[in-house]
Regions:
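Active-site and NAD+-binding cores of ADP-ribose-processing enzymes
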Residues: 1-39, 49, 56, 60-177
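Active-site nucleophilic cysteine motif
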Residues: 41-44
Length: 177
């Protein structure tokens, strides 16, 4: 597996499906409520609107009702990112444990000391890296995972909203703050 590191300039990063409007984003509150107890714990940002639309229903209540907000994600300062273009991530049936072990080994090869027992994304926070890979939806869309502990430089911008009634998404409309 090949990984490369890049520097992202401040500016638009992608899209985020949220239960809240952009004006209600609070990175301090998010960090206090977020858990870092999983390999992939983080703040997920879709590279395209199409990819992110798929997460809109996750923003509803248990009956499938509510309003989901598609916000534009900006970063306020430059950030370092690890890019993984391994196409095996595109498959939802791929053995993720094997991929995870390969990622950790590849990170060690580029001198980022991640132990096999370390949780991947939370550990990358210590070294101030985001992670980018393909989404597992058989597409060419990628997502950027910002470790929960690094969301201080995230700013959300109002973009679109969608009302859901009994799990059915209504017309997507633009919204302002």
């Amino acid at each position: 597996m090949e990984l490369k590191t890049e520097c992202l300039p401040a500016g638009v990063l992608g899209y985020k499906a949220c239960k809240y409007k952009a004006k209600d984003w609070d990175s301090t509150k998010y960090r206090s409520e977020a858990t870092n107890n999983d390999e992939w714990s983080g703040f997920y940002t879709g590279s395209t609107e199409t990819l992110t639309f798929g997460y809109m229903p996750d923003c509803t209540d248990n009956q499938g009702n509510g309003t989901a907000y598609l916000n534009i994600v900006n970063i306020t300062t430059a950030a370092r990112i690890i890019v993984c273009q391994d196409e095996r991530f595109k498959s939802p049936v791929q053995d993720k444990t094997a991929l995870l072990n390969e990622i950790k080994e590849a990170l060690r090869r580029i001198e980022i000391p991640v132990a096999d027992s370390d949780l991947l994304i939370p550990t990358l926070a210590r070294y101030r890296f985001y992670f980018k890979c393909y989404n597992n939806e058989d597409s060419n869309d990628m997502e950027i995972i910002i470790p929960n502990d690094l969301v201080d430089n995230v700013a959300l911008q109002s973009y679109k909203q969608q009302i859901f009634i009994n799990g059915v998404g209504q017309t997507l409309t633009k919204y302002v703050k």
